Curated annotation (Swiss-Prot):
Keywords noted in UniProt: FAD, Flavoprotein, NAD, Oxidoreductase
Regulation: Plant MTHFRs strongly prefer NADH over NADPH. Not inhibited by methionine or S-adenosylmethionine.
Binding site for substrate: 113, 193, 285
Protein name as it appears in the record: Methylenetetrahydrofolate reductase (NADH) 1
Pfam families: MTHFR, MTHFR_C
Assembly behavior: Homodimer.
Tagged with keyword Oxidoreductase: yes
Catalytic activity: (6S)-5-methyl-5,6,7,8-tetrahydrofolate + NAD(+) = (6R)-5,10-methylene-5,6,7,8-tetrahydrofolate + NADH + H(+)
Amino acid sequence: MKVIEKILEAAGDGRTAFSFEYFPPKTEEGVENLFERMDRMVAHGPSFCDITWGAGGSTADLTLEIANRMQNMVCVETMMHLTCTNMPVEKIDHALETIKSNGIQNVLALRGDPPHGQDKFVQVEGGFACALDLVQHIRAKYGDYFGITVAGYPEAHPDAIQGEGGATLEAYSNDLAYLKRKVDAGADLIVTQLFYDTDIFLKFVNDCRQIGITCPIVPGIMPINNYKGFLRMTGFCKTKIPSEITAALDPIKDNEEAVRQYGIHLGTEMCKKILATGIKTLHLYTLNMDKSAIGILMNLGLIEESKVSRPLPWRPATNVFRVKEDVRPIFWANRPKSYLKRTLGWDQYPHGRWGDSRNPSYGALTDHQFTRPRGRGKKLQEEWAVPLKSVEDISERFTNFCQGKLTSSPWSELDGLQPETKIIDDQLVNINQKGFLTINSQPAVNGEKSDSPTVGWGGPGGYVYQKAYLEFFCAKEKLDQLIEKIKAFPSLTYIAVNKDGETFSNISPNAVNAVTWGVFPGKEIIQPTVVDHASFMVWKDEAFEIWTRGWGCMFPEGDSSRELLEKVQKTYYLVSLVDNDYVQGDLFAAFKI
């Protein structure tokens, strides 16, 4: 979806939209840390995020890779910067074709900074001289496919600013006229350079309107995180610093936390003044840090740390090819990125009903399913790489996770238990202590309001429902006892399978069972998660593989702990259990063995 469409949609709904900007880190570890931070920030619902191109085109390949992951794994509408620096037309087209094939529809077209070691921009042979050329090229070659954003400079482009007096009136007017040419050439959105004098920005908006620029103009807000960085950035961009800001910073410039808190306060006040004029979108330059940007949005009441809205129980895809997808199997609830990778490239994605458009061709398991960000891998190593002498020791790990003593699990890409799981955490602890090792669960829900902070999704005004669900590993003797007990509970349905594919079940192999649904005004019933026998058979391979490639690999070859995990992998069963009575059912009654 185009960013301009999301901004106009938010304005039509009376909502204030916000967005975050990131830059490509220099190290692999930095990239993984950025994605962990980005995941947390995107949970707050930005309309889009953008990723910069890098000075002189120095990060072109990394920018393309990060943009792809943002759009298709983080599932946030992504806008990629594209510059003319060191970019002949064929490289520009390669970048555009790449993001188009990855389902990205948004570009921020820039001239770009001079290459490293140079003071002035020089047009590369076979390339473009300015952002206007780039906008014209994109529109001429790709028509209306891309949403094109361009930069606006409230104090004029830095090249037009001479000394501390700022740009001359003539230079400022020429810069405005050039901005209008970019919009007339096909740009549909303007995001501004950073500024700290709000009156200058508001005058800039008015001046744009006076010369016929009608598209939305989004203020670029850069929170002050530290004093030296603030001076470096404002010096590079030739940004005016109001005297009151200098006076406020001078006494605290050596106190980094005090500077950050002042930056949050200043950013909040700037945004309040801007929003009061009727502007309904804010763009936050994060510098790859989260605290200041999140602090400003919280102060403005645009987000709540304890109440993150969810359009669906899982984060919807933003890729243009799967944007209508609204049904998924529940099995990957704690491993959403693995699901995205294994379903990448489907011709169709389920919309409305799983059975109508499902594609059974899941991607094969690869190392990607079992690689983790370095920080998460370290946490797993600390919490799960402990000596294991018996299955009771294994059970203790699962129990500790359900009790919140551990914050990671080899079977989850998420941090700790999800809020809704805490409704049943006592029961989960009980059955894990009995040797039923849970990896996925949800409580029964009967008509909770859709804005409930624990189980809500889909926005206000609706009601949500859930069937109680459990997924766990257990030994064969425990499975036999459980199956016998289930016979007394007609509302319970199950599928049990071991690593080799030996299956026990009381449902048809063709059955598809909706386990989550929502009722909203003026809409058909939405059924976003299902239990599907065929998909469970695909998921079981991944789930069993985690015993060795996700946990056992933490121990050396021949280690007794590793051998114990391998034995469990070969002998245990993976069980999917649903209580179809979401009103009076008791899923855990069957475990009173």
